[in-house]
Design a protein with these regions (language model features):
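Adenine nucleotide-associated cytosolic modules
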Residues: 1-431, 459, 499
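Helix-biased "structured C-terminal domain" signature
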Residues: 112-114, 230, 334-773
């Protein structure tokens, strides 16, 4: 039997939001607020609302309100209350907590701070108890400048009963005069006369010979606010290093160059701390480099930040914001703006930005410890990146919705101040014939890098490719190598020279460390040289392993990232064989692709760009079943070595996929993307264009010999194994195992990238038994 609206709501206590209005209309009454509204159609609807709404204050249930009503009136009440609930115009509140020991605001304070209690009541239940908790909260405000003074005023004006201050603040020996601080004493005295006493305590002088240090100096205080000044970093960092005690909060307001920063709030179990914020801000490039140098040098030398400090209206804004933030943190009436976030204000323009703060992988307080890598089921990986449309769906208007949704998800990492990536840099670029995506990231001491990728279909796909490429750069150059918590001696070791990345030099003969890896073939755990996992890092300083991006992969999950890494490693292995003149390298005739739309489009675009492209099959299908195709320029379309293209002869790109057509598309796309940008800005070639770390540095592709006299065999629908059957990921692993080889995967991402759906790995290939020596 269907339940009536009255029966559904009879036991609830409806509480109408304070921003809801109702207005008479010719047909009844309309309920509305700033976000929308709805109409109740009834001849007496307005009078009905006038009589009923004052009783929807959460004090009584619908059943109690409807005592003595007839069935028709009860039905109207039920329909109205249900409509108010559905649209968020009202909420059901719980019955009052009358148990002993529950927090209750004293009557004088409840009368004096009725507006604050009403504000809490607008957003949350138990408003009186929430405000009583704020009133009982003991807050220590550190700092002696105008921001600290305004923070103290904000706290006591909104009902906080206990505030402790830096001794220099009331004494007038800091950035505030004694006369200016006298207004704080006057506010406290006025509240005391109204029955709302305020305790203004003075903290011990910092650096006292006999006084307690660290958190012990603030014993008894629930919230510590570092309210501005050049010494905030040197105040916050020791407290952070000691660890925020359980049940207490640390909230800083500080400056970074010409910006004022509020947050993040730190608790015993929070992630993303002041150190993370400073590291993120310092990696954004530009003026942030000088600001970071000033911050860390002032911290190391004990001189504090040398930049300008907030004053005047800006100090008042920041101080009031700090007080309001403590109010929100304690009452929970609204989500705190500094929980997992920072507020950044330009001190010249007063522009404010709120940005999410993720734990920085180099932060010693928030970096997650290394965990054992989980076995990866490579068969779960898609044959091509999941966000890409197929040729069959590309004409469909809805085909781009998947990539757009995925791009929106991953763009959470792109923020100008505290993002993993700083911004997209592809707006000025001409998006034809190929779509171009570029993303800027801070890549450690070498400064920002702009990583670019290309796509045949749409800019969303190009940006997704660029984010994946930038993620592998970030994992290599920013994320520190994970060290296992325990010893790895019990695990079998992979000899350095058995890896395809081994340079053959032998290095210094010593191993700098080991990293835990998992076999894609056997799922067993082994230990591999750390220098092979981070070939651009200090673990490979002796260049025992070739510095290359080979094996680096990124994807929406570990299987997809591992598949990308495996193809990258196979491409590098095939390229090395081709350079040595081993294996079979054959020219691919363009007509072998038939009428495949993507290859037809790309080869025609090459002619329009004035580039003559030669495609080489590097023969990888004979080894693993995958296909690796090299695209290289042999001159311009008119046959000359110079002309319309800014790319030099011998420019190259490589593609790897499960089938040869897809590999050729990847190779030609990346080669033509470079030609397209070079035709716009010639300086983008020759080192200006950054598509990620190099696969093989200083390669002159023109010197790769063609070892097969005839053209390569026509492309099959998918790469084939020895039996001629289509190859999938499982088939590739079986071929590797049959040759006595292995593929070892090491996750390289920190905790930040997976929050937006990006995982990164390094896949290491071992040599075949026949050439392991």
């Amino acid at each position: 039997m269907a339940t009536t609206p009255y029966a559904e709501t009879a036991g609830t206590r409806p509480r109408v939001r304070r921003d809801v209005l109702f207005t008479e209309t010719p047909d009844g009454v309309i309920f509305h607020n700033a976000d929308g509204g709805f109409q109740l159609t009834a001849k007496s609807g307005y009078r009905f609302a006038t009589l009923l709404v004052p009783h929807l204050d959460g004090a009584r249930t619908v059943e109690e309100i409807c005592q003595g009503f007839g069935d028709r009136q009860r039905a109207m009440v039920g329909e109205l209350v249900k409509a108010l609930y559905a649209r968020g115009f009202a909420r059901p509140v719980p019955a009052p907590d009358e148990t002993a020991g529950s927090l209750v605001t004293a009557p004088p304070a409840a009368a004096r701070f009725a507006e604050q209690i009403a504000y809490v009541d607008h957003y949350a239940d138990d408003a009186d108890a929430r405000f009583a908790r704020f009133r009982d909260t003991r807050v220590a405000v550190l700092g002696h400048g105008p921001v600290a003074r305004w923070c103290v005023l904000s706290l006591i004006r909104n009902g906080c009963a206990t505030v402790a201050v830096d001794p220099a603040l009331p004494a007038g020996t800091g950035g505030v005069t004694a006369e200016e601080f006298a207004t704080v004493h006057q506010e406290a005295a006025d509240l005391a006369e109204q029955g709302c006493p305020v305790e203004l305590a003075v903290l011990p002088a910092p650096g006292g010979a006999s006084g307690p240090e660290g958190w012990a100096a603030y014993t008894g205080y629930d919230v510590v606010v570092a309210a501005g000044g050049p010494d905030v970093p040197s105040t916050v960092l020791p407290l952070l290093r000691e660890g925020v005690p359980e049940g207490r909060m640390l909230l800083p307001a500080w400056t970074f160059g010409q910006r004022a920063v509020v947050g993040p709030v730190m608790t015993a179990d929070s992630t993303g701390c002041w150190s993370c914020a400073a590291l993120r801000l310092g990696a954004s490039g530009g003026a942030a480099d000088a600001a970071a140098a000033d911050l860390w040098s002032g911290l190391a030398l004990g001189t504090g930040s040398s930049g300008a400090q907030p004053a005047g209206p800006l100090a008042a804004m920041l101080g009031n914001l700090l007080g309001y933030e403590v109010f929100r943190l304690v009452t929970g009436a609204l989500p705190a703006e500094t929980r997992g976030q920072v507020l950044i204000q330009d001190m010249a323009s007063f522009d404010v930005a709120s940005e999410r703060l993720l734990p920085h992988p180099r932060c010693p307080f928030c970096a997650a410890p290394a965990r054992s890598p989980e076995p990866v089921d490579l068969s779960a990986a898609p044959a091509r990146p999941a966000f890409l449309p197929t040729v069959a769906t590309a004409p469909d208007d809805d085909a781009a919705q998947g990539p757009l949704a995925e791009l929106e998800r991953r763009s959470a990492l792109v923020r100008p101040h505290t993002g993993v990536f700083t911004r997209y840099a592809d707006e000025p670029v001409t998006q034809t014939p190929l779509k171009v995506g570029s993303v800027v990231l801070g890549a450690g001491p070498r400064g920002p890098r702009t990583v670019t990728a290309f796509d045949v279909h749409h800019t969303a796909g190009a940006r997704l490719r660029a984010l994946n490429a930038a993620a592998t750069v970030y994992a290599e150059h920013v994320v520190p190598a994970a060290r296992a918590a325990g010893t790895l001696d019990a695990l079998p070791a992979v000899a350095p020279d058995t890896l395809t990345l081994a340079s053959g030099t032998g290095g210094t003969g010593t191993n700098s460390g080991w990293t835990l890896a998992t076999s894609l073939v056997t799922k067993e755990e082994v230990r591999v040289p750390a220098g092979a996992v981070r070939p651009f890092g200090t673990d490979n300083a002796d260049r025992r392993f070739e510095p290359t991006r080979a094996g680096a992969g990124a994807g929406a999950d570990l299987p997809e990232a591992s598949a990308a890494g495996l193809l990258s490693a196979l491409a590098h292995d095939a390229l090395r064989r081709a350079v040595r003149g081993e294996g079979e390298v054959a020219v691919i005739a363009p007509e072998s692709f038939g009428e495949d739309p993507e290859t037809v489009f790309l080869l025609r675009s090459a002619a329009h760009l004035g580039v003559r492209v030669e495609l080489l099959d590097l023969g990888e299908h004979a080894y693993s079943g995958a296909s690796v195709v090299l695209a290289r320029t042999t001159g311009t379309a008119d046959g000359s070595g110079t002309g319309g293209s800014s790319l030099a002869p011998g420019s190259w790109a490589v593609g790897a996929a499960l089938d040869r057509t897809a590999a050729a598309v990847d190779a030609v796309r990346d080669l033509l993307g470079a030609a397209q940008l070079a035709s716009e800005a010639p300086e983008s070639t020759g080192g200006g264009l950054d598509t990620g770390d190099p696969l093989m540095r200083d390669l002159d592709a023109a010197l790769i010999p063609v070892t097969r006299s005839g053209p390569a065999a026509p492309a099959a629908p998918a790469a084939s194994g020895a039996s001629g059957e289509a190859v999938d990921w499982t088939g590739i692993l079986e071929r590797l195992a049959a040759a006595g080889r292995d593929a070892l995967v090491v996750p390289t991402h920190a905790a930040d990238l997976p929050t937006a759906g990006i995982h990164t790995v390094r896949v290491l290939l071992t040599r075949a038994v026949t050439d392991a020596g």
